[in-house]
């Protein structure tokens, strides 16, 4: 059966793979987009975004504050690269690295917005570069986000039935699940799923199997917040024939 440990490991490996690949692409873009604002006009949005990241900018360019000073695309790409690295550290630490969390992107949409600001400006004076690797990178981020690929989870139905029965048995305000008819089970489950909050469960009495299933569901919720809402695809309960 699926465990929360293997699920976390798979998601973190996916995130690490795609975020490291973004770093490779950003370094290539930094070598390509070498336009100088002493020669061409750069859109004000690029400078505005650099200013928004002033605190991180100081950390990125602490060794040479004037590096890429007349090459705003390269300067902003350096900041984006630092944010991607921080995002990966934040995810790999499962949210415990507070320094990384401060500099990390909250979601892939924030990264897309930064890249689109650059592309919009580049397209005003150099469409070849605007439609090249930069556009490819944007498309990749739109497709893969921080999760690379949606992870489906599959559990067998009898496993779920045992877990639900155990939860009912551990909750003083719920009936004996095994004694309920099929219709009664459906009614109880529908009623519980329709309202917020959870039954009063005495967790000390739960079996290891139930604890593992609850840990899995908690991991799914945590990872969706950490990596992105598209981290998981379908949750499949196989061989389902009753409640």
Residue ranges and their predicted role:
Residues 153, 237-242:
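Active-site beta-loop-alpha junctions enriched in small/polar residues
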Residues 1-6, 115-117, 229-230:
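Short acidic (Asp/Glu) and glycine-rich catalytic loops that position anionic groups and cofactors
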Residues 31-226, 233:
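Extended, charge-enriched "interface" segments that sit outside catalytic cores
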Residues 2-29:
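Extended active-site and interfacial segments that coordinate phosphate-rich ligands
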């Amino acid at each position: 059966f699926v465990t929360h440990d293997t699920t976390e490991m798979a998601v973190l490996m996916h995130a690490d793979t795609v975020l490291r690949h973004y770093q490779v692409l950003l370094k290539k873009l930094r070598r390509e987009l070498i336009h100088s604002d002493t020669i061409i006009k750069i859109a004000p949005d690029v400078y505005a975004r650099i200013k928004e990241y002033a605190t991180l900018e100081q950390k990125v360019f602490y060794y040479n504050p004037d590096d890429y000073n007349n090459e705003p695309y390269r300067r902003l790409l350096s900041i984006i690269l630092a944010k991607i690295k921080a995002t990966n550290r934040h995810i790999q630490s499962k949210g415990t690295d507070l320094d990384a969390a401060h500099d990390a992107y909250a979601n892939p949409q924030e990264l897309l917005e930064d890249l689109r600001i650059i592309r919009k400006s580049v397209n005003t004076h150099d469409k070849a570069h605007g439609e090249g690797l930069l556009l490819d990178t944007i498309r990749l981020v739109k497709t893969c986000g921080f999760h690379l690929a949606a992870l489906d989870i599959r559990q067998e139905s009898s496993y779920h039935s045992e877990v639900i029965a155990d939860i009912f048995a551990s909750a003083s305000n719920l009936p004996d699940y095994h004694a309920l008819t099929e219709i009664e089970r459906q009614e109880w489950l529908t009623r519980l799923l329709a309202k917020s909050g959870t039954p009063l469960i005495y967790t000390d009495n739960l079996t290891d199997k139930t604890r593992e299933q609850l840990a899995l569901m908690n991991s799914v919720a945590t990872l969706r917040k950490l990596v992105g809402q598209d981290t998981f695809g379908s949750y499949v309960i196989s061989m389902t024939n009753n409640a």
